[in-house]
Amino acid sequence: MSPAMNADNPGAAATAVAAIAPALKAEILAEALPYIRKFHGKTIVVKYGGNAMTEEKLKHGFARDVILLKLVGMNPVVVHGGGPQIDEALKKVGKVGTFVQGMRVTDEETMEVVEWVLGGEVQQDIVMLINQYGGQAVGLTGKDGGLIRAKRLQMPDRENPGAFIDIGYVGDIEAINPAVVKALQDDAFIPVISPIGFSDDGQAYNINADVVAGKMAEILKAEKLVMMTNIPGVMDKKGNLLTDLSAREIEELFADGTISGGMLPKISSALDAAKSGVHSVHIIDGRIEHSLLLEILTEQAFGTMIRSH
């Protein structure tokens, strides 16, 4: 087992900090103290996806960042995606992924691929990297400790009110039992959650990772929900970054089509989390190295903040 992550483990802290560029390190150290005090003991849910999961430098940087958050007394919980990895695996079996309203259509064969890729390959890679740098990560799916109970999602057909679209084994969260996550946090572990839910009869369901992250933040009463993506944040139709969005403004962006595709479940989940009492919800650019640390430990504004009012 990896060394315990606490103040008595300076080796892990040194490993996590050493790879950060000197200028960035100085900035973080100068600004971090009030944020460390503010968020000490608080839960930070991180939706991990996009280039940050596929580019080697960003992957290693993310692992160090999560460890550093744990070392300074926060409780990071990672919920990961894996769209590109699923697409690649589907290609190998002669299938092409299709999406409806940002949700992956999931037939039986696709569900098997999703389980193997998310609950196996992707999760193990994240856990291995965190442990490699001195952290203690544990991988979970919805089956572990009854974490995520799900049922088949009823996707409303926007063109035919009252009708639904069958998108296969895509899950709608019925309940989250946070006991296993809280137990891991209490023992200084970092939970890494694959977005796969299970019904009472054992049927696996593919659940959008943004949806799982938002619901997990709500149930855990998280201080922050940070969603990492491949764009600077929410953009308007001219490509300008919208740094702050209220619930009313989000509804307008939904209505005029500015927010569409894969951003639909992301923004909906972010807004639901904010309305549920998560104090701070941010969508940030995961392509920027150490963007997670910069968002949490410095005054530097990143991405888009989602507000419930």
UniProtKB/Swiss-Prot annotation:
Pathway: Amino-acid biosynthesis; L-arginine biosynthesis; N(2)-acetyl-L-ornithine from L-glutamate: step 2/4
Major location category of this protein: cytoplasm
Site entry: Transition state stabilizer: K47, K266
Enzyme class, UniProt record, top EC level: transferase
Subcellular location: Cytoplasm
Residues annotated to bind substrate: G82, G83, R104, N206
GO biological process: arginine biosynthetic process via ornithine; L-arginine biosynthetic process
UniProt-listed Gene3D superfamilies: Acetylglutamate kinase-like
UniProt-listed CDD domains: AAK_NAGK-C
Entry annotated with the keyword Transport: no
The enzyme's E.C. designation: 2.7.2.8
Keyword Nucleotide-binding: yes
UniProtKB keywords: Amino-acid biosynthesis, Arginine biosynthesis, ATP-binding, Cytoplasm, Kinase, Nucleotide-binding, Transferase
Any one GO MF annotation of this record: ATP binding
Reaction(s) the record says it catalyses: N-acetyl-L-glutamate + ATP = N-acetyl-L-glutamyl 5-phosphate + ADP
Listed GO CC annotations: cytoplasm
One Pfam family this sequence matches: AA_kinase
Role this protein plays: Catalyzes the ATP-dependent phosphorylation of N-acetyl-L-glutamate.
Family to which this protein belongs: Belongs to the acetylglutamate kinase family. ArgB subfamily.
Name used for this protein in its record: Acetylglutamate kinase
Organism: Cupriavidus pinatubonensis (strain JMP 134 / LMG 1197) (Cupriavidus necator (strain JMP 134))
Lineage: Bacteria, Pseudomonadati, Pseudomonadota, Betaproteobacteria, Burkholderiales
Underlying gene: argB
